[in-house]
Amino acid sequence: MEIFEKLPDEINHLVSEFSSTPVVGDLSCGITQYSFWLIVSTIVLLIVLAVFKKKQTLVPKGFFVNGFEYIIEYVENDIGKGVVGENWKKHFPFLCSLFLFILINNMIGLIPGMKPGTGAIGSTAALAIFAFVYFIYYGCKAHGVIGYIKSLAPQGVSFPMNVLVWVVELFSTFLRLITLAVRLFCNMFAGHVVMGSFAIMASMLMQPLLQQVSAAHAVGALPSLAWLAILILIYAIELVVGAIQAYVFTVLTAVYVSEAEEVAEEE
């Protein structure tokens, strides 16, 4: 079919649309479309927090306040108390901010015509660096820089195996930085490519009917309804995936913080 012959070119064009293009300046020193929507997401988050603070009462009222309080309490109970443990209070502001920031960026990216701030590897790398520096800082603060470095090798391992284990653990620690960034980026990128592909299929199959209404074209356009139904299903799944990715990123950060502080307590 002619439609399927055009599909590879359409998919290639779709993928090229996800590349970073400058909105202001150039790629080396400017604002790309992902940076722009990252800024927009930050503004939206600040507005949401301001509205929530203004409407917050002793007894929550309204869908917005109740919904937002549920999200905050979920992060507090499941990630803060559940993962970090007794020291959760001092880490809660960072973890909650991280979760909400990633969540807002992921959700905005699902609105047609907008881009997710987390759709560029540079953005996810920056978030990963923040998380990495955060748990390293608290690890060093808990029992000193030298103590934290030495703690990477478990106690009870004799020389020279302890040196080998220390090198492996050091590599594993820095690998966290890469996995945090790549996991979030790849999941968001892949999801948008899949949605775009199904949208292309639906529009290409529907196009003959839109150009000339006839019974033959109507029958030929029926498969587009199936593609459209699948697209709607994938869109709903992407909403869930966007929330899950924000959760996974925040949970892993909490785990790394907890591990750093647990080592200090054991010493």
Predicted features, each with a name:
Residues 1-267:
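Selective transmembrane helix interface/packing segments
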